[in-house]
Amino acid sequence: MNSYFTNPSLSCHLAGGQDVLPNVALNSTAYDPVRHFSTYGAAVAQNRIYSTPFYSPQENVVFSSSRGPYDYGSNSFYQEKDMLSNCRQNTLGHNTQTSIAQDFSSEQGRTAPQDQKASIQIYPWMQRMNSHSGVGYGADRRRGRQIYSRYQTLELEKEFHFNRYLTRRRRIEIANALCLTERQIKIWFQNRRMKWKKESNLTSTLSGGGGGATADSLGGKEEKREETEEEKQKE
């Protein structure tokens, strides 16, 4: 609590009707004779308790708008309140700016690794090749060999026993039934026909020369038939 305050019992009147409060400290000895009087005003002025320098309005009365060392009235209270609110607003603004800066820095820290990953160039030899699906990356990479299950091989052998050449529609049906691609069915049948030709040629050579000629003619017919079938599929 401040030691300076306005005491109505210590005011004195001037000729113009204005009250003038002398700037005297609370612990001053000049207040001691006046503290026990109930009256104030003209009687206090007649007693002349204070010396003449304290009655000079030019020296003691503050007319400027700036706050003096003893200006503790209502205006100063509101000024302090406004200053306190401004300080709080500045503090809140500083806190929000700090939080925004932290969020921005964290976002930059997150996006930096992603940018680094995107900027890394991946070459074909760095990618992994799937040997089971037969899908490889790069033109110079050798495709992996497809591994067929026992059930798939059995169904394909049955189909090959009845039809050595498949139409596109039948190939799609078998691929959907065996969970394979159309290309895998086509490659399997091509390989199976080549194997069948070799087996037929081998049996013909073992049986005799005449049989070998007939086997060769049959092999040539099979090759021509295969070529025509592939041309039809391309069309």
Curated annotation (Swiss-Prot):
Motif (Antp-type hexapeptide): 122-127
Keywords noted in UniProt: Developmental protein, DNA-binding, Homeobox, Nucleus, Transcription, Transcription regulation
Signal peptide interval: none
Cellular location(s): Nucleus
Region (Disordered): 200-235
Residues of the DNA-binding region: 141-200
CDD domains: homeodomain
Main location: nucleus
Ranges in coiled-coil conformation: none
InterPro entries xrefs: Antp_homeobox, HD, HD_metazoa, Homeobox_Antennapedia_CS, Homeobox_CS, Homeodomain-like_sf
Function according to Swiss-Prot or TrEMBL: Sequence-specific transcription factor which is part of a developmental regulatory system that provides cells with specific positional identities on the anterior-posterior axis.
UniProt name for this protein: Homeobox protein Hox-C6
Source organism of this protein record: Homo sapiens (Human)
